[in-house]
Every structure is written in structure tokens, then in C-alpha cells.
Amino acid sequence: MKILWAALVVTLLAGCQADVEPEVEVREPAVWQSGQPWELALGRLWDYLRWVQTLSDQVQEELLSSKVTQELTLLMEDTMKEVTAYKSELEKELGPMAEDTKARLSKELQGAQARLGADMEEVRNRLLQYRSEVQAMLGQSSEELRARLASHLRKLRKRLQRDADDVQKRLAVYRAGAQEGAERSVSAIRERLGSLMEQGRLQALTSQPLRERAQAWGEQMRGRLEKVGSQARDRLDEVREQMEEVRVKMEEQAEAFQARLKSWFEPMVEDVRRQWAELMQKVQVAMGASTPAPSQKP
């Protein structure tokens, strides 16, 4: 009987040892702690999973209350959102890159993103499954469930790290392509500016005779304008002299006409004056003859 009990105990211990895998140390990605925003978000998710993997009393309590899965969902969404934002930022700088190369890099990065998202989703589903299994045990011992969960979490964290490293490498290739494209753009701009400066210098050299001809033409036009102005001033002086001559002639003609009028009317006036004087004299004489002489008293 004792032998049977001993065999049973050995079998149980062997089974427990088979279920619980030896814990393999997972390398902590220190680069996630200080890098791009998506790396910082992934670092927060990694730290949270490491805390969940401890399966402490607080962790188990929050697992049963769905708090862990809710927090994990927020961290997953934040991480994937930052990855997408960083990818979009790099894509804007990939202009000079060939379209086929850009399409290939984008496809590879999308695949890495999908694998990373699937890893996160599997972690969450495994935690939900653990919650359902614990609730189904109705107060019975859950040590075996915790052991299996710890084993799964170790495997999932290793897979998550592998796929996160893959995403990081793909983004590094993207970033290198963006930097190369930026350098090509700067080089093209420099070449273009150099070409424009050379063209400007050549145009300046070729435009020198044009400027000289323009200056000569301007001097010629200025001389012509001055000549025309001088001629106009001379003509104006001539017109003024002619007007003065006309005025003098008109004054002389007016004086001559006045003299002629005077010579016409003066004899007539004198004749009328003389006749009037004679008439008045006759009237006076006639009036004197008709007046009676005063009578003399004796």
C-alpha cells in the first residue's frame, strides 16, 4: 500500500514538473525605454506585461475584474497608433525613392505590424481565457491554471519581442530611406541652385552689351528731346514776337482810324457851332428890334 502511495506521489510530482516549464529569462529591450514615441509606448506595454507575468495577488484580482485586459487594450491601441503615425511620418520623406522599392518596404512593414498586433491580441485573449477558466473552477485550486498562464505569457513575450524587433528593423530601413531621400533632395536643390547661379552669371555677361546699347539709346533719346525742347522754345519766342508785332500794328491802325474820324467830324462840328452862333446872334438882334423904347415925361 505504501508502495502504491509512493508511486502515486512520484507520478503527481512528475506531472506537475512537466506542466511547469522552466522559466527562460527574456531579454529586456532597453532601447524601448528611450526612443521614438512608438518605442516608448511599446516599452510601457512591455513593463505592464512583465508585471502581469508576476501573477501576484493584485494581478489575479485585477484579472478577475477585467481591469488588466482593459488596461492592456489601451496600451495595445496606443502602441499601434504610434507605430502607424511614425510610419506615415517617414513615408512623407520617401519621395525620391523608387516606387517599387517604396511599395516593397511598405508591404514588409505592414506585415511586421500585423504580426505585432496579432501577438498583442493573443496575449489579451489568453488573459481572457484564464479569467474564464478561473471563474469556471468555482473556488477550486487554480495553481495549475496560473502555471500554464505563466508559461504562455513567457512564450508570448518572447514572440512579442521578436516581432517588435522586426518592426523596429523595418522602421529603421524606412528611416534610412527617408534620410537618403532627404540627402538626394538637398543635393538636387544644390545642383539646381548652382545651375541657376551659373545661368544668372552668363545672362549677366550676355546682358552687358544690351545695357550699353540701352544706355546709348537713352542718351540719344535725351539729346533728341533736348533738341526738340530747344526748338519748341525758339518757336515760342518767334510766336511771341509775331504777336507783339501784330499788337503794335493793330494799335497803329486804331490810332490812324481815330485820326481819320476826327478829321471827318471836326469840320462838321465847327460848321454846326458857327451856324448856331450866327443863329443866336440873329435871334438876339430880332428881339432887340421888337422891344419898344421907354416913354419920356414932360
From Swiss-Prot:
Annotated region (8 X 22 AA approximate tandem repeats) at 74-244
What the entry lists under Gene3D superfamilies is as follows: Apolipoprotein (1.20.120.20)
Instruction: List localization entries.
Output: Secreted; Secreted, Extracellular space; Secreted, Extracellular space, Extracellular matrix; Extracellular vesicle
Keyword terms of this UniProt record: Chylomicron, Endosome, Extracellular matrix, Glycoprotein, HDL, Heparin-binding, Lipid transport, Lipid-binding, Oxidation, Phosphoprotein, Repeat, Secreted, Signal, Transport, VLDL
An example GO CC term for this entry is: high-density lipoprotein particle
According to the record, the signal peptide region is: 1-18
Q: Where, per the database record, does this protein carry Phosphoserine?
A: S141
**LDL and other lipoprotein receptors binding, as annotated region:** 152-162
Q: Which InterPro entries match?
A: ApoA_E, Apolipoprotein_A1/A4/E
Q: Binding of heparin: at which residues? A: L156, R157, K158, R159, G218, E219, Q220, M221, R222, G223, R224, L225
Q: Where is this region: Specificity for association with VLDL?
A: 260-272
Q: Residue positions of the PTM Methionine sulfoxide?
A: M137
Q: What family is reported?
A: Belongs to the apolipoprotein A1/A4/E family.
Database matches in PANTHER family: APOLIPOPROTEIN, APOLIPOPROTEIN E
Under which name does UniProt file this protein? Apolipoprotein E
Q: What organism is listed for this UniProt entry?
A: Dolichotis patagonum
Q: What is the lineage of its organism?
A: Eukaryota, Metazoa, Chordata, Craniata, Vertebrata
Q: Its gene?
A: APOE
